[in-house]
């Protein structure tokens, strides 16, 4: 923020979530067309030409829509990894996840059960997670002030060598699988 004191205040998740909440609330109530336009009509009356009054109302509506468009409303997850066959692939044993969370309710984000770095003024988060060999279903949760889940998303990340041949059909003969290499069951497997 341009104002250091305001920046320090907004860096507190409990303050930032209330800021986002009230910003949205004001846009939905006081600055809604239903409430603001009668106020403009009452205050301006016949003092300004109708075109100027309409311009004021149009400006207020556009400003309101812009403000609402700046408020993150959904939990998003980005991996920065290449995607193949429906999975993200990582050669590394760690992956960095990032995204946004619902700004008006979120005070913390967890990635795979661990606290993510939460940048409250932007409703943005980032986390480094450890991957096991094979398919990792990573759970990201946005939490409110009481620790309740607000939203959740999954990211499926494959770590290590991809299976040479996805399994998923009828087994017609004996098969021996070991933990030395990950297996991917892509279709129903009939034994």
Regions found by a protein language model. Name each.
Residues 58-191:
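Low-complexity, disordered linker/stalk regions enriched in Pro/Thr/Ser/Gly
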Residues 1-94, 99, 170-171:
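Middle-to-C-terminal accessory/interaction subdomains
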